[in-house]
């Protein structure tokens, strides 16, 4: 299991209370297809839409991953900066 998959799984678990059916389907389908970047993007969008906080430690790990990820073409880092923490 990759570090990115583990991070995505932890983010999904932390954000699960704010998922609707479409979010849940999208996130877990993308994870199973190996599209963690897209799953993380959907998780952050759901968290922002519902104003749901994410644990600070987990958000720090996401920011560290984003700092080295070449795949931020949809503004994920900007959206992540707006997420509330617990």
Describe the function of each predicted region:
Residues 1-86:
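C-terminal-biased regions
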């Amino acid at each position: 299991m990759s570090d990115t998959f583990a991070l995505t799984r932890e983010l999904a678990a932390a954000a699960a209370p704010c998922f609707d059916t479409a979010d849940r389907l999208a996130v877990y389908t993308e994870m199973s297809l190996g599209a963690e970047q897209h799953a993380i993007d959907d998780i952050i969008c759901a968290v922002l839409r519902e104003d749901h906080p994410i644990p600070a430690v987990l958000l720090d790990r996401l920011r560290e991953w984003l700092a080295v990820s070449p795949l931020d073409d949809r503004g994920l880092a900007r959206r992540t900066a707006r997420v509330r923490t617990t």
